[in-house]
């Protein structure tokens, strides 16, 4: 059996070998490996989120938004002192578009102020504001009241802004500066009522036109009336035009016309006169990174009398220093209308004539800043006046009113300085001082009614987003005044401190308080006109 298998194997080998010898060996040999194993990536486990709710968080999130601090240079303008020591207007209303502010004080003085805004501020904007205030002092007829309303509007086109204003001002003062032990006047006898309506319209370009010209002309009309005594109408037209001649040079021309018509009422002598000022102010301007110079002469006409006034001023920037040197020699004509002078002294009697003031100012000063928050300026001026109005008591009658005595020629060596520390809109501390050294008078013994020295300090602090605190302090040396028989004296110095605060209760309501004349210093700005003592007012503001 085994032999058979062996023989069969030999025969198979002999048969298969020739066949295998015929196989093509020129091709590559390939070995196929077949496997049932298949590699796969392992599935990762998913994160399982908790079904519990997050806890509520009602805290207010304040996103960081840093605004660079601004260095502001404040300009202080003289204001008249009313029987109330300080102006009751509050800076705390800034940023509120529509509000009603009401209050009451210890001097039987109601206070109300309202402000409304309309328009989107892009195509048009209209602002309507009104305020009323009155007070009653301890002296007979030491009363005061004022109602003011203003309508301001602007229309914005692609290249111009058309603006206008309509204002109403009703003000009651009283001549209470007489000897009350001798004279007994009724309230109507000493009433000094001013009624004023003022309108203004103008246009100014928003972008420089193809000719490279900037312009901003306006027309102002004022109707002023002193109850049963006088009326005065004024017309003012100003056209400033500026054209650029490149990056360094430009020219500017300003045309000014100021016309007043004055007439008395219910007086023994019928008084009527016109007062006209016409002034041309051409300027050639040179401006580069370090130097700015304005140069020119100003032909002017004062009631037909020709005057040529200087108009040269400029500033130099000190390289690599935060310092600017200012210099100049300028001149101007100042309209001494009854309205303008009564803003300074409301106890004037009617005019019999009117003279405008010619002013020439030779000055030098510096303006600078230190760090990011402090700015300051200093200015020395040598002023020369012609026909400067001085205020003297009417000693011929009852000494309760004032006359105008024009000084034909007077010099003033003036020094001004101011400094401010400002941190954005959160904190502001400003101080200013003015010294006047009048000399070389020709017609008057002293500069009656002028203040030799004045210091003003103002403080504003937004402690939180709901609480704001403010404070104002003023000190001045008394003005010289004239008594009977040419006896001259000076008013005692005056100091006035006021404080105020406002607290926002919610988005709609705020509470405010003002305390004026904290020292209870019953000083005088004008002889025989003592101001109120301490005055406390408080109330609420409704915002909507």
Per-range role (PLM):
Residues 21-90:
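N-terminal periplasmic/intermembrane-space "pro-region" immediately following the signal or transit peptide
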Residues 88-95, 120-123, 156-161, 207-215, ...:
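Short loop/turn motifs that connect adjacent beta-strands in outer-membrane beta-barrel proteins
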